């Protein structure tokens, strides 16, 4: 989706590295422009390659391996590199455990699965009672081979692609979906009503938290729910925050905003 590439482009600029992101036309333009702004280069994989060489996600991964080898570079491989979830295990997991040692639930989205897997593993090792809830876009195929298209670009994984090794399914207690319409209208609600510019991954957790609490009224068993708010909305200005784009895709829904207003007072 481009979130990791943005971060790596920024780090590379600060440390003087040459950086190339392997992308396709489906990545949001705002993210691609951010990578360019940090001096990063973009290598585009095409839909034609998708038809010839397997799923486009797998084409991107193979292209990254090939270019790294040809140019004496390093392919960080966010999908299978165990250092990815380990980074969250040693940082975010510890931070949350220190701040909320008695949390009942951890809610986060899964793309490569690294942030939720690493964080969730640390918390479970230190809190036997915590439950981990994994969210993916409706249409994603992490837990079902029968996916379909969706517009959310942060979390999720398309049907037919080789699944990442970084997802630790053993620590996931509950799995659920959030639809495009729910996520994008939540993004717009928090920007317009709360002054918070959140991305689609963050919006998924915020919407699901409302749904979860409503379906499970606060009781002695549910006291503290920790949400991973993992992305900013600045990378989504050209679609989720664009009225014309939302209308074109038939995603605007005032009822969702009303529902959120009643919950997030």
Question: Where does each model-flagged region fall?
Answer:
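Conserved PLP-anchoring active-site segment centered on the Schiff-base-forming lysine
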Residues: 1, 16-29, 221, 225-229
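Short glycine/serine/threonine-rich phosphate/pyrophosphate-binding segments
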Residues: 1-15, 28-32, 109-120, 201-209, ...
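Buried hydrophobic positions in well-ordered alpha/beta secondary-structure cores of metabolic enzymes
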Residues: 2, 12, 35, 76, ...
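A glycine- and small-aliphatic-rich helix-loop capping segment at beta-alpha/alpha-beta transitions
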Residues: 11-26, 121-131, 242-249
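Small/polar-residue-rich loop-to-helix segments that shape phosphate-bearing ligand pockets
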Residues: 20-105, 137-185, 191, 264
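Short beta-strand segments
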Residues: 22, 77-78, 109-110, 134-136, ...
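Phosphate-binding loop/pocket of nucleotide- and phosphate-handling active sites
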Residues: 165, 210-265
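Active-site-adjacent helical/loop segments in soluble small-molecule enzymes
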Residues: 167-220
